Amino acid sequence: MNQNNISATELFQRVRELLTLPDLEPKTRNKMMHDTLILCCHEGVKDTKQAFGNLFSQVDYLCKARGIKVADKIAIQTMRRHSNSQEPLSGEDLKYDARALTLFISAVFEERIPHEVNVLIPHINRPFQKGLEINNRRIRCIVKNWDSDFIRVDIDQDADEEEYLVRLKDEENHIDHTYLWDLLKEGMQLNLLDCQVKQPIITPRLIVVEPDYLVDISSIATCFTAFGHHPLLYLLNLMKPRANTQATLLGNFAGAALDDIINSHGKYQVNETVKSNFREKALEFCTCPWFDAKKFYTDASLQAFNLQQVVDILFPHTASQAKMSAFRGESLYDRKKAILEPSFVCEALGIQGRVDLMTTDCKLLVEQKSGRNMNIETHQVDPAYHSYQLEPHYVQLLLYYGVLQHNFKLSNDRVNIRLLYSKYQPQDGLMVVAYYQKLFKEAIEYRNQLVAASFEIAKEGFEHTLNEFTPEVLNVAGTQDFFYNKYLKPQIETITNPLHDLSPLEEAYFCRMMTFVLREQMISKVGAQEGTNTSSSDLWTMPLTEKKDAGNIYTDLHIIRKEQSCAGSGYDTITLSVPDQGKDF
């Protein structure tokens, strides 16, 4: 069958055959369903000029683009998972999956389901198994004690019970928080998210340890390496000297170029970005070792060219481009609503970060990467995710997505997320990815582990952890391939070997200094005494009256003027009216 000329009629016929041919092996039937789904997705996304992480993200994208109902979308993704398996399906499951596939084909091709197929499939969805009934989105609590099944807590809400029990495991709803056994301490604060409360038992989908201790999202993502993600990797990365390489300078340029392209309204000049970027980063350019100016300019021009194409795809500025996007069923994003590098704090998840590009209506979220992606260059998918995106970049994007969800109370299908590898043309580099809940939870679990480790070291002293900073301990995945031994392990040893060659006096000094730094960092994040105005968590923990008394906030401000410092830039200067803030402010 010619994939380039596939029709809905042919795909419907394949569905009819997988339901009616009597001699098909179960695994052959599943593969036939899977191949039909692939053909349908190929037809749906072939003109989008975007790359897709895997079949999961293609299905997710097309369901959003075609306005498929949430219940049907769940059924379609269930069918996709079943088709990936060689396990035989029951006759009932096969019919429900065939129904989901038929609905998907109908939506993608915008054609009615033929009668001869319609009579073979159920007219309603598979009975939905009701999951956890969420009746409280967020509960702050303090740990009293715990056992293998429950954490006993005092909650920071009006409540009838003096003590609540937080369930650690619920197999029916695929909830497992038992990794917390090794992290919990009496007096530890927790955020319980997406909870079912049946007094006195709380069953949360997500638990965040010491949420006032904000961790930078990019720092978490960097720790997802080919050799695993040990909690001490976070501290190891903090010990590394700040990188100043041609690659980091190119990444900074690419971010500036995206900003200029968005705000240039079709009149972009790459040389202007090069000049302004050099003015802002003159010291870094001058001190960058082995800097190759000619190669930098060539690479920068390629990045800018690719970014211009990406912006035209995401924000069509001509009627013909907009019409083509609408014809493909894609969401249209408003360039006027685009904002670059907005910063967020998320007390719910205990993380903070700066998004590369999003729209103010939260319909679009883009994370940009300027470096190489060998999966794209070799056309080999990551076996863990069957996709081309790199794991740390996927983690970073999912955490930003989680911030938007929890800060703005957004549903799962509200935000469209993209990974942008700007070294490559949009058909390879502008990658549509889907929300992967398992990896998101793994990232939050890792965040909890590194926070607990930081608290423990700050309390007990760095000397108790010093001997754990070795490649053998940090390599939790047991990786021993050529790339690890040739490149990654020597990078680790550059930091860890000097730690084990210290004299007793040097070791005592270094451990005392690290303990002091970690304690100061902890105080700056969570504070040492309430009301002293010393920590970043005062932003959400300090009452308004105390903020006013401390001169920590202006209220009732109004924007009276906005200005551009130069043509082609966004509005970067605003004038505010400041009413009287009260006596002794």
Predicted features, each with a name:
Residues 257-340, 508, 515, 521-525, ...:
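A non-catalytic, helix-rich entry segment at domain boundaries
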Residues 31-35, 249, 253, 395-403:
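Short amphipathic alpha-helical face segments that pack within enzyme cores
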Residues 1, 126-127, 382-388, 416-420, ...:
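Helicase P-loop NTPase motor core of nucleic-acid translocases
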Residues 130-140, 161, 167-288:
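Charged, glycine-rich intrinsically disordered N-terminal tails and low-complexity linkers that flank
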Residues 1-113:
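Amphipathic alpha-helical interface elements
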Residues 112-139:
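Short boundary/loop segments of OB/S1/cold-shock single-stranded nucleic-acid-binding domains
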Residues 153-185, 333-448:
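Mg2+/Mn2+-dependent nuclease catalytic core
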Residues 134-198, 526-585:
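Conserved ASCE P-loop ATPase motor domains encompassing nucleic-acid-directed helicases/translocases
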